[in-house]
């Protein structure tokens, strides 16, 4: 049986069953080398359903599947990365998820920049919105995506750049869900 047929059959099952949704997710992991775009598009459905059923059913298995679904997309999807890296953070210390509604447009613009759909991105927002922290998340995401490539940063303040550098190192070393 071809992988695409396997995926189709997996998604025809009762996906409110944790085992069935897990099988559907596993089929997407098999599909990824053959059809990357379809695998990651369908994974958004797995993530939506696993979040819904985790809440409705109070299911730990669905909750964990939601985490695995985020991890599957995190190297390629900045929004998924931002949610995944804070998975184990104490809710009161989370940055992205509580502000996601406001920062999602900026995260999508940063995604477009990383995907070479934009040559330049200028972000102008009021102080305290979260530009710097989101930029730190972006730098760590880029560093993880392309560890062999350098990242150049500039600022009016050497102390600010030193702080950004140290925070990036902290994020890279201590963010392991």
Residue ranges and their predicted role:
Residues 1-118:
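N-terminal accessory segments
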Residues 117, 146-147:
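A structural signal for short coil/turn segments at secondary-structure junctions
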Residues 118-135:
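Walker A/P-loop
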Residues 122-124, 152-155:
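A structural signal for short, well-ordered beta-strand segments and their strand-loop junctions
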Residues 136-145:
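Walker A/P-loop NTP-binding motif
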Residues 138, 163-171:
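Alpha-helical scaffold elements adjacent to nucleotide-binding pockets in ATP/GTP-utilizing enzyme cores
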Residues 153-166:
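Conserved Walker A/P-loop ATP-binding site and its immediately adjacent core
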Residues 174-177:
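Conserved small/polar residues in nucleotide/adenosyl-binding loops
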